[in-house]
Amino acid sequence: MVCYTNTPEEEREQLQAFLTGKSVHTLALFDHFITEFQKIGPIAVHPAKTMIGISNGRKRIVYITRLGKDFLLVVFPFKRRYDDNLCFEKIAQVPGDEQCNHYFRMLQVEDVNEELRTYMSIAYGG
């Protein structure tokens, strides 16, 4: 299991509860995604009622909205559309806002490739 040093203790307990009962494959995907984000910079993991937010210390930068049987669904909220990519399965503008949510479905650890790492870095610094 990944070390969540920047995540407050009470949120670590919530996270454990959130992850309980998930498949070994899904947990491996989750750990890999978090580990890859930690290579970019320090992050904190914030579980909520229906999703898990990841922050860079200033703001939440991505949201894991679904931990399926064999996948993760991750939303990257950007201020603009990034249409020219192969990693996002859907891009939707938030009504009445400039925010565009970019949806990434992770099925294998290899899905976190150089292209996605570029968008992870944009999210981290944005």
Predicted segments with their positions:
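Charge-dense, helix-prone N-terminal extensions
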Residues: M1-G126
